[in-house]
Design a protein with these regions (language model features):
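Conserved small/polar residues in nucleotide/adenosyl-binding loops
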Residues: 147-151
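Active-site-adjacent beta-strand/loop module that shapes the phosphate/pyrophosphate-binding cleft
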Residues: 88-112
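NUDIX/MutT-family hydrolases
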Residues: 104, 113-145
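Conserved hydrophobic/aromatic beta-strand scaffold that supports enzyme active sites
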Residues: 30, 40, 102-104, 123
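A short coil-to-beta-strand element that immediately follows conserved catalytic motifs
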Residues: 77-87
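Conserved Nudix-box catalytic region and its N-terminal flanking loop in Nudix hydrolases
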Residues: 33-73
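Acidic, metal-coordinating catalytic segment for phosphate/diphosphate chemistry
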Residues: 1-28
């Protein structure tokens, strides 16, 4: 009986590793202009408005990933100074294990063109977001509004 238990336990352990969601780490940037409006992007391949960002590549730091994604999606370049981290958020929808680090960016300039994957880049007041803003984006903006958008 103990042999059967051991076999079942080992089988359970192996199968449970296949059930586990792959951990992914991504970055999003809440870029503010001089009027505290928020930069949002609309992708060419999906509906809705989102904070710019994306996945962190193997060997890439969080800051480097944020800088790369901002450059690709918005043309925004950042100075050498560190940016503010607002928080780390998790999503376990659709059997995923996504973890997103949200940065607040106030010091930036435009210096490059936008990737063809981006249909539109625009700035919006936090209380006047466009129709189609994703629920997660809206939640992040509300959370940041309490700490970073106060004059």
């Amino acid at each position: 009986m103990s042999d059967l238990r051991g076999l079942l336990f080992r089988l359970y352990k192996r199968l449970s590793t296949f059930r586990r969601a792959k951990l992914t780490i991504g970055v999003r940037a809440l870029v503010l202009d001089e009027e505290n409006r928020i930069c949002l992007v609309r992708h060419s391949y999906r509906d809705g408005w989102y904070l710019p960002g994306g996945g962190v590549k193997t060997g890439e730091s969080l800051v480097d990933a944020m800088q790369r994604e901002l450059r690709e999606e918005t043309g925004v370049e950042l100075p050498e100074t560190p940016q503010s981290v607002h928080g780390v958020f998790s999503s376990f929808r659709e059997h995923k294990s996504d973890h997103i680090v949200v940065f607040v960016v106030k010091d930036w300039s435009i210096s490059s063109s936008v990737s063809p994957e981006i249909a539109e880049v625009a700035f919006f007041a936090s209380d006047d977001l466009p129709d189609g803003t994703s629920a997660a984006t809206t939640r992040r903006i509300k959370a940041v509004s309490y700490t970073h958008l106060r004059a």
